[in-house]
Amino acid sequence: MGALRIDSHQHFWRYRAADYPWIGAGMGVLARDYLPDALHPLMHAQALGASIAVQARAGRDETAFLLELACDEARIAAVVGWEDLRAPQLAERVAEWRGTKLRGFRHQLQDEADVRAFVDDADFARGVAWLQANDYVYDVLVFERQLPDVQAFCARHDAHWLVLDHAGKPALAEFDRDDTALARWRAALRELAALPHVVCKLSGLVTEADWRRGLRASDLRHIEQCLDAALDAFGPQRLMFGSDWPVCLLAASYDEVASLVERWAESRLSAAERSALWGGTAARCYALPEPADARL
């Protein structure tokens, strides 16, 4: 029986415009409910047997919602939720979810006006230190231009895994008109990859291209360049596949996203390295239990 293949990054929501202000003009495909019954046939078609559900908005009710879904659905292997890490009663708040599939936390750092000041805040730093001391993962969500702002933060918090979402969001939409964009992102990525406790999700790249005009052949080449750069920086044992469904639907179908990474991996990685990319690294970092049966 083969190892369980895992989609390390996807979202669920019951859509209300007030809850998801980031779903704006031109994003109508996202302005509807997305729940497990819609995802799991797509996963099955790609031989993916489990997923990690990641928060898509701030609020403790978001965490509770995802954990409720995970309780009823075996294929949701883990939840990356949201919590106010600056709260003085953080330990008590997180204790409410003990015994669940909660494995980590995330905040949309990319939306903060001053990312460096946010992560340098003493209360936030105390919260992240507590998470790591208690074996919770922290997912880091920033744009390429913000990577230098989290370098020192990531270096300081080295007691447990940090996961860089979407490969640090390279500015793919700029690659054709800015010869420095790829090199700038790659240099910042290598700085983070030098920290052995930082791992990287190969996720969310299709929507960093100019998805409003549709993906072009040049976009696919640039995405492959980014995949190569991430492999060069992190090595094959610190990469994990994530679909970023349903956000990926702005640019490509679930099958297209998974197939793009599959083709790339087949041409670059050994069988053991592909096993790490497609589940082994996610299982290790998020401390997922060994499945009794990896059947879909």
Curated annotation (Swiss-Prot):
Named from the GO MF annotations, one term is: hydrolase activity
GO annotation terms (biological process): fucose catabolic process
Q: Does the keyword Hydrolase apply?
A: yes
Q: Which Pfam families match?
A: Amidohydro_2
Q: Cofactor note, please?
A: Does not require a divalent metal for activity. The purified enzyme contains Zn(2+), but the addition of chelators does not diminish the catalytic activity of the enzyme, indicating that it does not require a divalent cation for substrate turnover.
- Recite the UniProt keywords alphabetically: Carbohydrate metabolism, Fucose metabolism, Hydrolase
**Catalytic activities:** L-fucono-1,5-lactone + H2O = L-fuconate + H(+); L-fucono-1,4-lactone + H2O = L-fuconate + H(+); D-arabinono-1,4-lactone + H2O = D-arabinonate + H(+); L-xylono-1,4-lactone + H2O = L-xylonate + H(+)
Q: In which pathway does it act?
A: Carbohydrate degradation; L-fucose degradation
Top EC class of this enzyme: hydrolase
Give the EC number(s) under which this enzyme is classified. Answer: 3.1.1.120
User: GTP-binding among the record's keywords?
Assistant: no
Top-rank lineage group of the source organism: Bacteria
Family, per entry: Belongs to the metallo-dependent hydrolases superfamily.
Q: Anything further noted?
A: It was not possible to determine the kinetic constants for the hydrolysis of L-fucono-1,5-lactone because of chemical instability, and thus, a stable mimic (4-deoxy-L-fucono-1,5-lactone) was utilized.
Q: What's this protein's function? A: L-fucono-1,5-lactonase involved in an L-fucose degradation pathway. Catalyzes the hydrolysis of L-fucono-1,5-lactone to L-fuconate. L-fucono-1,5-lactone is the best substrate, but the enzyme can also hydrolyze L-fucono-1,4-lactone, L-galactono-1,4-lactone D-arabinono-1,4-lactone and L-xylono-1,4-lactone.
What is the protein's quaternary organization? Monomer.
Name under which the protein is recorded: L-fucono-1,5-lactonase
